[in-house]
């Protein structure tokens, strides 16, 4: 399996390459080298723990963008049953960068919505690299209204570089579509649980990110601008993206310290892409707990608490 090791993971990559080489040799040789393979595997595990215990904000941002990372459809397949995708905004078109539909979670009917990136080149282009156009956000709002009508809890999965800034998208009202979603989600009379699974890129993420709970995976990020974009503005050079990532405080744990997310769901060692099954189990348990807590509240309490959450953001304290 191609794990697509990042630059800071190269020492791990070298060890894994040696392990793979020994496995091939072991099939052909009469000598038993299983002990050597086990020793290298243990060494790789210790090295991985050491590297991942000291990640910078920029390295975490790179992990959030990892091409092997599970996307919305992977989480839908792993966490929900009987998913039926719904298409179109009933105004202009369908947008494959946003996927959504009805499903069951622990047997309970729910609505699921998320950003979807592509794996190969053709799929990336079709999904517009996970950058929704206005019709994507309007489709999401249509599904949320449907969920409210039928009293279905809403789960959203956020993973986008941002809303698509193309001319056509702007002509069709990109900012209006995002703003309308923010206003509508603040008042929807059904529980909403949002999870940042990778990149939480500015308004493009917020447009499906207003809810009663905001969860973030351990190696996800959330920011008003990309580190490269911030560095280009402040220092006129995208090469200072690492400095920008640190200064903006974009990581899940830093945002939790600031009270901007409700829970950090820890990822398996090496990231969600290294062990998707373990990631699904951890996230399923967290989503189940949060949904049970929210369904125990009255609609009036739900809306009042959601309003207070929104009003608490951005407060300055000495």
Swiss-Prot record:
Pfam families for the chain: ACCA
EC number, as in UniProt: 2.1.3.15
Subcellular location(s) of the protein: Cytoplasm
Gene3D superfamilies on file: 2-enoyl-CoA Hydratase, Chain A, domain 1
Keyword Disulfide bond: no
GO molecular function ontology, one term from the record: carboxyl- or carbamoyltransferase activity
A GO CC annotation given for this chain: acetyl-CoA carboxylase complex
Alphabetic keyword roster: ATP-binding, Cytoplasm, Fatty acid biosynthesis, Fatty acid metabolism, Lipid biosynthesis, Lipid metabolism, Nucleotide-binding, Transferase
Keyword Cytoplasm: yes
Residue ranges of every copy of the CoA carboxyltransferase C-terminal domain listed in the record: 32-293
Annotated pathway: Lipid metabolism; malonyl-CoA biosynthesis; malonyl-CoA from acetyl-CoA: step 1/1
Superkingdom of the organism of origin: Bacteria
Matches recorded under InterPro entries: Acetyl_CoA_COase_a_su, ClpP/crotonase-like_dom_sf, COA_CT_C
Catalysed reaction, written as an equation: N(6)-carboxybiotinyl-L-lysyl-[protein] + acetyl-CoA = N(6)-biotinyl-L-lysyl-[protein] + malonyl-CoA
Signal peptide: none
GO BP: fatty acid biosynthetic process; malonyl-CoA biosynthetic process
Entries under HAMAP family matching the protein: AcetylCoA_CT_alpha
UniProt family annotation: Belongs to the AccA family.
Subunit structure: Acetyl-CoA carboxylase is a heterohexamer composed of biotin carboxyl carrier protein (AccB), biotin carboxylase (AccC) and two subunits each of ACCase subunit alpha (AccA) and ACCase subunit beta (AccD).
Described purpose of this protein according to its UniProt entry: Component of the acetyl coenzyme A carboxylase (ACC) complex. First, biotin carboxylase catalyzes the carboxylation of biotin on its carrier protein (BCCP) and then the CO(2) group is transferred by the carboxyltransferase to acetyl-CoA to form malonyl-CoA.
Protein's UniProt name: Acetyl-coenzyme A carboxylase carboxyl transferase subunit alpha
């Amino acid at each position: 399996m191609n794990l697509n090791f990042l630059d800071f993971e190269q020492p791990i990559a070298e060890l894994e390459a040696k392990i793979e080489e020994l496995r091939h040799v072991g099939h052909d040789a009469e000598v038993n080298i299983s002990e050597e393979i086990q020793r290298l595997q243990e060494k790789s595990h210790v090295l991985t723990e050491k590297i991942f215990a000291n990640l910078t904000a920029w390295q975490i941002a790179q992990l959030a963008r990892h091409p092997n990372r599970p996307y919305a459809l992977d989480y839908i397949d792993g966490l929900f049953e009987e998913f039926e995708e719904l298409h179109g905004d009933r105004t202009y078109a369908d947008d494959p960068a946003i996927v959504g539909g009805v499903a069951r979670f622990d047997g309970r009917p729910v609505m699921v919505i998320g950003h979807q990136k592509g794996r190969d080149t053709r799929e990336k282009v079709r999904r517009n690299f996970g950058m929704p156009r206005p019709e994507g956000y309007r489709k999401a709002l249509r599904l949320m209204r449907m969920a409210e009508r039928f009293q279905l809890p809403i789960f959203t999965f956020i993973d986008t570089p941002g809303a698509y800034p193309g001319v056509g998208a702007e002509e069709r009202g990109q900012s209006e579509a995002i703003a309308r979603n923010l206003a509508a989600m603040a008042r929807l009379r059904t529980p909403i649980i949002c999870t940042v699974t990778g990149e939480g890129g500015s308004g493009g993420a917020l447009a499906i990110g207003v809810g009663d709970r905001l969860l973030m995976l351990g190696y996800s990020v959330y920011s008003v601008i990309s580190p490269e974009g911030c560095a280009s503005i402040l220092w006129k050079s995208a090469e200072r993206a690492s400095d920008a990532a640190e200064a903006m405080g974009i990581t899940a744990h830093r945002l939790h310290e600031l009270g901007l997310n409700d829970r950090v769901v820890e990822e398996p060692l090496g990231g969600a892409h290294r062990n998707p099954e373990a990631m699904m189990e951890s996230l399923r348990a967290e989503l189940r707990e949060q949904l049970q807590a929210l369904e125990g509240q009255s609609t009036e309490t739900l809306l009042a608490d959601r309003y207070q959450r929104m009003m608490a953001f951005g407060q300055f304290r000495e």
